[in-house]
Amino acid sequence: MSAYDNVSVINEDVLKVDLRKLAQERNGGKPIKVVANLPYYITTPIIMSLFESHVPLKSLTVMVQKEVALRMQAGPGTKDYGALSLAVQYYASPYLAANVPPNCFMPRPNVGSAVIRLTRFEETPVQVKDEKLLFRLIRASFNQRRKTLDRKSVV
């Protein structure tokens, strides 16, 4: 990748590196594109950390477990729609770019994979005063799908 002056390979723990600072230093604070093959067991924390930290992201293209990619792009009323769908779609427009079957890997995993591109909205679809409260409410709502929510579930 050294032949490209607009590509940086960053070999760091994405949950520990200050990507806002890195984007400022390497790209003058302009929006960046992140491309990664994420560890499947921490996909959601990584993606949400990138969005919630307000790193100047233009897009995020990642390989994830297929089931997770389907949940990210699921629409209301579908069985895959949940807290992850709502959270991702609050920040970005998801697009399933490719399915990657298990036989593409050695050793062959027991799960399918997918490449999903999340194109960040310039402005979120709705304006809220307290995003932390919004996401607590979303998590509580989907954790209690068949139960009635009470005030203690959210606060």
Can you say where each PLM-predicted feature lies in the sequence?
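Active-site-proximal catalytic alpha-helix in oxidoreductases
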Residues: 143
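Catalytic cores of RNA-modifying enzymes
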Residues: 1-140
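Short amphipathic alpha-helical/adjacent loop interface patches that line ligand
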Residues: 146
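Conserved small/polar residues in nucleotide/adenosyl-binding loops
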Residues: 152-155
